[in-house]
């Protein structure tokens, strides 16, 4: 058996090492290219993911800014609406107060008119009662004076007219 095929000989191991080395170089070069290509593909995938993440982050930032702007606008509008409502409440209060004062004044005037009317009516009734009483007293005084004497028809007629005029 030749020496390079005998595993007990050093030449065998040198040949085996050379074949392994050449196999590694030959297949390693291809493997290196494949590994490099796989690493490049993985790097490209990672870069694409990073780019996508950056794009999503920018989009999220823009959305956040938009939402913050909308929120600020909504808060401004809410404050404006609240201020407007407060002004309207004050106006309604003032109007209600004015209407209440007007109603109170109108009722006061109506009460004064009723009181004045009642006073005038009472005064008229008192005057009528006083006139009737005066007429009755005058009639009784005249009747007492003329008792026994002949009654004058003119006096009787004047007394009758006096009673009708006083009423």
UniProtKB/Swiss-Prot annotation:
InterPro entries: ATP_synth_b/b'su_bac/chlpt (IPR002146). It is found in: Cell inner membrane. The keyword Cell division does not apply. One of its GO terms (cellular component) is proton-transporting ATP synthase complex. The chain crosses the membrane at residues 8-28. It comes from the Bacteria. It is a single-pass membrane protein. It holds the Pfam family ATP-synt_B. Keywords: ATP synthesis, Cell inner membrane, Cell membrane, CF(0), Hydrogen ion transport, Ion transport, Membrane, Transmembrane, Transmembrane helix, Transport. GO terms for molecular function: proton-transporting ATP synthase activity, rotational mechanism. Belongs to the ATPase B chain family. F-type ATPases have 2 components, F(1) - the catalytic core - and F(0) - the membrane proton channel. F(1) has five subunits: alpha(3), beta(3), gamma(1), delta(1), epsilon(1). F(0) has three main subunits: a(1), b(2) and c(10-14). The alpha and beta chains form an alternating ring which encloses part of the gamma chain. F(1) is attached to F(0) by a central stalk formed by the gamma and epsilon chains, while a peripheral stalk is formed by the delta and b chains. F(1)F(0) ATP synthase produces ATP from ADP in the presence of a proton or sodium gradient. F-type ATPases consist of two structural domains, F(1) containing the extramembraneous catalytic core and F(0) containing the membrane proton channel, linked together by a central stalk and a peripheral stalk. During catalysis, ATP synthesis in the catalytic domain of F(1) is coupled via a rotary mechanism of the central stalk subunits to proton translocation. Component of the F(0) channel, it forms part of the peripheral stalk, linking F(1) to F(0). This is ATP synthase subunit b. The gene is atpF.
């Amino acid at each position: 058996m030749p020496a390079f095929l005998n595993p007990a000989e050093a030449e065998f191991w040198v040949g085996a090492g050379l074949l392994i080395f050449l196999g590694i170089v030959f297949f390693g070069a291809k493997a290196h290219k494949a590994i490099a290509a796989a690493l490049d593909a993985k790097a490209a995938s990672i870069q694409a993911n990073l780019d996508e993440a950056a794009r999503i982050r920018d989009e999220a930032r823009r959305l956040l800014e938009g939402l913050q702007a909308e929120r600020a606008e909504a808060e401004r509008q809410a404050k404006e609406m609240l201020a407007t409502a407060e002004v309207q409440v004050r106006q309604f209060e003032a109007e209600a107060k004015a209407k209440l004062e007007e109603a109170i004044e109108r009722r006061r005037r109506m009460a004064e008119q009723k009181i004045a009317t009642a006073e005038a009516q009472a005064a008229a009734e008192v005057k009528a009662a006083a006139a009737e009483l005066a007429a009755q007293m005058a009639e009784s005084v005249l009747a007492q004076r003329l008792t026994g004497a002949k009654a004058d028809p003119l006096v009787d007629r004047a007394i009758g007219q006096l009673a009708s005029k006083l009423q």
